[in-house]
């Protein structure tokens, strides 16, 4: 799984223009709708140097999207083609305190660097600039507590590099005990909450290691943006008479983890929340209970949520009706999904 909901972004530089995914757009819809925005590359680089906000080039009255929050990172990279994904395999390594050491052997022979965690936008772009200055040949960047960036001079080569990294970092998902249908059925009866249609979600409640990891805190920004600052949990034994108030009082969460039983979903859960939860589940299923993890600090989480996180979430959720059938699709042919059409990457050249 390379992307979930509207996360991940791609770009291509053509004749001085940086074509970048619009904020809130879903890569899974790249063949069905316009998702790219044209940016003047020279102006974008200058804006990054000044620490300003990058604006789209107004070459069309139909451009109503904001550039991706990662536009600054794409602008400072010298490569013609850039693919940034939230690969569940990469993230499972990128959340580890010993991630650099663990990846050294797996990525041997590739030109890669580990980028310490930095908030998306100008701070992350600065870290990328420093990395490129250290080693200009770098074309694979592992973003701590975030994801993966691969780069190249043409679409085909960049796609193949992405696949190569995925093969090297692949981790088998840990099996999990079956959910307790009696307990979950009781929740549905008293609260109206829904049983997930994606069985792996139950691992968050039935797999001891997954639950422990989940309770530890926020592993990466999209988790906080779409799913909240902590996972809502219920003990395996609870008073059914108090259940409805627990799940519906105030602002109810989009999901609840029932310890040793499974997971239930709020009927109002959005496609973006669902896709993010599936991605989170697949990450923790690939993370060993004994792994030394590096969770985001309170300050880092607050910065994510308060500085653009809510707006990013709102933009992503405006796409939920169109994306209901493709919320968590893999990009099977990245050249197609990245650049919307052959117009942006003609014949893969």
Regions found by a protein language model. Give the residues of each.
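Glycine-rich flexible loops
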Residues: 1-329
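Residues immediately within or flanking Cys/His clusters that coordinate Zn2+
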Residues: 342
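Short, intrinsically disordered C-terminal tails of secreted or membrane-associated proteins
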Residues: 346-347
